[in-house]
A protein has these predicted regions:
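N-terminal alpha-helical interaction blocks
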Residues: 1-58
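RNase H-like nuclease fold core
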Residues: 1-22, 66-74, 81-114, 118, ...
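Alpha-helix initiation and N-capping motif
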Residues: 29, 41-44, 128, 145, ...
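Catalytic cores of large soluble enzymes that bind and process phosphate-bearing ligands
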Residues: 31-39, 107-111, 123, 140
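Glycine-rich, N-terminal phosphate-binding loop and its surrounding beta-alpha-beta segment
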Residues: 50-78
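Short, charged amphipathic recognition helices of the HTH superfamily
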Residues: 123-136, 198
Length: 207
C-alpha cells in the first residue's frame, strides 16, 4: 500500500493511491480506510498551504508585520493529525504573533472546520469519552477528552456570537397552538467534587 502526491497545479491536487486487497473483506476495508485517511491528510496539508501567504510583509491595524519564517504546527483533521509549516508574523517591536493561514482556514483551536463540526455534532448525542472512542475506532484521529471538550466550548462560543447577527424566518406551524403548558421539577444529581445537589428542570409543551 502507498499514497503519493503526484502534482499540485493551481487549485488541483493529483494523488496516486495503491491499496492491497485481501481475501478478508474486513482487512480490505481497513486497508481502504487507512489509505483514504493518508490521502486525506496529504490533501488537507496541501489545502492549508494553499491558504498561506508567500512570506511577504503584511499590514495589520496600521502596522507592518513581517514573517518569522515557516514554523511547524500540528492541526487536527477528520483524517488524522497534519503538521504544516506555515508563516507566522510579528511586528518589529515584538508582541503578539499572527498566522494568516489560521484565519483564512477558519481554524478553531488547532482543528479544521470539518473536524470541529464532526466533533461538536457527535458530542451533542454523547459524552466526550464516547466521542473519543468513536473517532479512534471509526475514523482516525486520536485526541484527548479534554481537547474534545474545549473544542466544543470554542464552537459553542462562536455560534453564540454569530447568532446575534443571524436572521431566519420562523417555520410555519402545521397546527395553531392555542396554549402552552409550563412545568418545573427538581431532581438530585451526583457531582464529582460537591456530592449530591438539587437540579431544577423546566419544560414547555404546546397544547
Amino acid at each position: 500500500m502507498g499514497v503519493q502526491r503526484i502534482s499540485i497545479e493551481g487549485t488541483k491536487v493529483k494523488m496516486e493511491v495503491t491499496i492491497e486487497l485481501s481475501r478478508s473483506m474486513l482487512t480490505s476495508e481497513e486497508n481502504i480506510k487507512q489509505s483514504l485517511n493518508e490521502t486525506g491528510c496529504m490533501v488537507t496539508e496541501a489545502a492549508l498551504k494553499y491558504l498561506d501567504t508567500d512570506g511577504s510583509a503584511i499590514e495589520s491595524a496600521g502596522a507592518v508585520m513581517r514573517t518569522k519564517g515557516e514554523q511547524p504546527k500540528a492541526y487536527q483533521t477528520p483524517y488524522g493529525e497534519v503538521v504544516v509549516h506555515r508563516h507566522v508574523y510579528q511586528r518589529s517591536g515584538g508582541g503578539k504573533t499572527y498566522c494568516p493561514l489560521e484565519r483564512e482556514a477558519r481554524i478553531i483551536m488547532t482543528s479544521t472546520p470539518l473536524f470541529a463540526k464532526q466533533v461538536s455534532s457527535k458530542l451533542a448525542y454523547g459524552s466526550a469519552r464516547e466521542v473519543q472512542r468513536d473517532l479512534a475506532e471509526n475514523h482516525s484521529p486520536l485526541v484527548a477528552v479534554s481537547y474534545i471538550q474545549r473544542l466544543c466550548e470554542a464552537v459553542a462560543s462562536i455560534i453564540e456570537t454569530k447568532e446575534e447577527s443571524w436572521n431566519y424566518v420562523p417555520p410555519k406551524m402545521d397546527v395553531e397552538i392555542h396554549s402552552v403548558a409550563i412545568g418545573l421539577d427538581g431532581t438530585c444529581m451526583l457531582l464529582c467534587d460537591n456530592g449530591w445537589r438539587e437540579a431544577m428542570v423546566g419544560t414547555l409543551a404546546p397544547l
